[in-house]
């Protein structure tokens, strides 16, 4: 076992998960839907920064989540703590600027899948600014067509109340629920990597299943665009 895997196991099982269960009403459902071996994509909604602890903490196996590059940047003490936490929890840095840089980042995710491991993705690309479920980015579909594996839809609820936007302290005692749905198979789309309609259809089907599990209202708008709208209204 590599030193990084040892660090992940120690951080998760001896520190993170015990703290989550101590501080919050942390519930996990549907763990039997996670394959005990082999590659799969864990596709989750994204409500709060601490999803990066609650979701991996609920998964028995090691899982590498794709995280935005800003979480790995900065030289301040706070930035270093966040960066260390993200790496300890198995996060992989992803460039969301588009083009070659984004494709290269997704390539790192494909390597994880080819190695027979679990890869975690937030298809919305960023946290929901309003509690609703937003239009998914098609990067997840590209990964699926390049490296066909099952998709496990994941729904988290309550994490947005643990550390609301702008809050400085955690709200202890809040209920947080993580639910894993049944595996989804997209092998019927094999060979259609360049078909943008297929990419959108796969992504929308995944988002629909996440929404069914989470009970969130779905809006066909990217979360990043919705965030700008919310910011403009509050300005």
Describe these PLM feature segments.
Residues 2-3, 7, 103-235:
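Non-catalytic C-terminal accessory region of glycerolipid acyltransferases
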Residues 30, 45, 67-68, 122-124, ...:
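A secondary-structure boundary/capping signal
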């Amino acid at each position: 076992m590599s030193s990084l895997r040892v660090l992940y196991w120690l951080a998760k099982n001896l520190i993170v998960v015990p703290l989550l269960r101590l501080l919050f009403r942390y519930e996990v459902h549907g763990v039997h839907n996670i394959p005990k071996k082999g590659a799969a994509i864990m596709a989750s909604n994204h409500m709060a920064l601490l999803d990066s602890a609650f979701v991996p903490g609920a998964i028995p196996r090691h899982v590498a989540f794709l995280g935005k590059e800003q979480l790995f940047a900065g030289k301040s003490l706070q930035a270093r703590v966040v960066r260390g936490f993200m790496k300890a929890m198995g996060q992989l840095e992803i460039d969301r600027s588009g083009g070659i840089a984004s494709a290269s980042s997704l390539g790192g995710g494909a390597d994880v899948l080819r190695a027979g491991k679990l890869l975690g993705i937030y298809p919305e690309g960023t946290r929901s600014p309003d509690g609703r479920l937003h239009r998914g980015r098609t990067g997840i579909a590209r990964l699926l067509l390049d490296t066909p594996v099952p998709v496990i839809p994941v729904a988290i609820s309550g994490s947005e109340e643990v550390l609301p936007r702008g809050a400085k302290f955690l709200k202890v005692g809040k209920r947080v629920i993580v639910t894993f749905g049944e595996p989804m198979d997209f092998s019927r789309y094999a060979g259609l990597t360049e078909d943008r309609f297929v990419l959108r259809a796969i992504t929308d089907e995944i988002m629909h299943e996440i929404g069914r599990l989470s009970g969130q209202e779905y809006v066909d708008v990217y979360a990043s665009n919705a965030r700008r709208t919310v910011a403009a209204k509050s300005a």
